[in-house]
Amino acid sequence: MHHRKSGRHLNRTSAHRKAMLRNMAVSLFQHELIKTTLPKAKELRRVVEPLITLAKEDTVANRRLAFNRLRDDAIVAKLFKEIAPRHKERPGGYCRVLKYGFRNGDSAPMAIVELVDREESESSED
């Protein structure tokens, strides 16, 4: 039975799913806006939001936890120095998921995931 199980399987093994969500989180922190399928976008929120909350308090322990989840030094530095300070006053809801129509090949529902207080000077990825 599938009672009280949280999270989506996304038709992947647990290792593949974990690696995919890690890569998507790194891409989101790097570009601050990514395009993906709607179920992946909704699942990505569950990875990104706690990381930004963690980064609000800049300690060595928190940086190590973030590195353990992202495995990218440059992105961890950006998360703690640029992204988290922008969201200091916000009590959650750091990323926005916008529906973006359907993919041509298989009509999969697409979505744009963006950080709420992202810099507008960033070029959009369409």
UniProtKB/Swiss-Prot annotation:
Biological processes, Gene Ontology terms: translation
Disulphide-bonded residues: none
GO CC, one annotated term: cytosolic large ribosomal subunit
Keyword Ribonucleoprotein: yes
Pfam families: Ribosomal_L17
InterPro entries: Ribosomal_bL17, Ribosomal_bL17_CS, Ribosomal_bL17_sf
Entry's Gene Ontology molecular function annotations: structural constituent of ribosome
Keywords, sorted A to Z: Ribonucleoprotein, Ribosomal protein
Presence of the UniProt keyword Ribonucleoprotein in the record: yes
Subunit annotation: Part of the 50S ribosomal subunit. Contacts protein L32.
Family that this chain belongs to: Belongs to the bacterial ribosomal protein bL17 family.
Protein name (Swiss-Prot/TrEMBL): Large ribosomal subunit protein bL17
Record gene name: rplQ
